[in-house]
Amino acid sequence: MSVPAFIDITEEDQASELRSYLKSKGAEISEENSEGGLHVDLAQIIEACDVCLKDDDKDVESVMNSIVSLLLILETEKQEALIESLCEKLVKFREGERPSLRMQLLSNLFHGMDENTPVRHTVYCSLIKVAATCNAITFMPTDLDQVRKWIVDWNLNTEKKHTLLRLVYEALVDCKKSEAAAKVMVELLGSYTEDNASQARVDAHRCIVRALKDPNTYLFDHLLALKPVRFLEGELIHDLLTIFVSAKLISYVKFYQSNKDFIESLGLSHEQNMSKMRLLTFMGMAVEMKEISFETMQQELQIGAEDVEAFVIDAVRTKMVYSKIDQTQRKVVVSHSTHRTFGKQQWQQLYDTLCSWKQNLSTVKSSLQTLSPTA
């Protein structure tokens, strides 16, 4: 992709024009080109370009596009430090101001570079940082498949890969994209190995807390399989996660009574935890029983008789459980419930169900062929 130039002249003259323009705006820069070559000129121009960022958007974009067009003709090994310097300027200059302009300038640079250029990673990270400051992350490509491809294309080492994923995660969280953020965090934690899992302690801790805090997240068993999370075994945060994975409400109540300060230190709401654990307990009951008496509901969920109906209605709204209320017989009739954990037993049940469907379809097909040989 070509980037519009500041003026259609030679690179040396273009650098000279940029120097003159910046000096006219008050920058401390010589109007004479450096004897060190274009990359030295660009280093000095980028260092002084702050002054033009105060101008009108069109003027700023014209100047910055000129700088970008010169950057892109440099040898790859000379680009990296200069691009990093320019990105830092655009991210930090009057942070919070004119985000759409800064995003446009970074986007011009990003799309003007070859797709496989490693330093493109720096530009992408800068775009994410600016987008997060103005709640514009939805306009950024953060799809995991695309991000995975870039990680490969840019040949990122482990540290840069983790930094990129963590940055995307934090931006999504800041912009209230909790579901997308959770997927990115799982991707991040899943990229650690047995050898470096201990380094992800903070990320694993944060991932668990975010998941527990999210009012729309009810399934947690996949987190237990992540190596950094397994590294937390024996700690209170892991014990708490295990309760939300498979235990009942009473287990959470006992945990809370012994660890009130810990729950508060995590920034978790006890009332929200109670509400979520009631639903999770109900889900577990609904898997095992197709009919649940009001009395059992009251006892297991620690709610009053007058609250059972409202609870069931709210539970059905989450689409984790499908059931109806039988007022006459004072019971809840379950038609379906999501499993809180999905292990070998659940896979076997799924296999048996699919085999049964296959057999039934074969029977239907045979019956149709009997009625009509051409069927």
Curated annotation (Swiss-Prot):
- Name the keywords, alphabetized: Cytoplasm, Initiation factor, Protein biosynthesis
* Pfam annotation, one family: PCI
Q: Which domain of life is it from?
A: Eukaryota
User: What do the Gene Ontology cellular component annotations say?
Assistant: eukaryotic 43S preinitiation complex; eukaryotic 48S preinitiation complex; eukaryotic translation initiation factor 3 complex; eukaryotic translation initiation factor 3 complex, eIF3m
Which subcellular locations apply to this protein? Cytoplasm
Q: Which GO terms describe its biological process?
A: cytoplasmic translational initiation; formation of cytoplasmic translation initiation complex
Q: Which InterPro entries does the entry link to?
A: ARM-type_fold, COPS7/eIF3m, eIF3m, eIF3m_C_helix, PCI_dom, WH_DNA-bd_sf
Q: Which PROSITE patterns match?
A: PCI
Assembly information from the UniProt record = Component of the eukaryotic translation initiation factor 3 (eIF-3) complex, which is composed of 13 subunits: eif3a, eif3b, eif3c, eif3d, eif3e, eif3f, eif3g, eif3h, eif3i, eif3j, eif3k, eif3l and eif3m.
Q: What is this protein called?
A: Eukaryotic translation initiation factor 3 subunit M
Give the encoding gene's name: eif3m
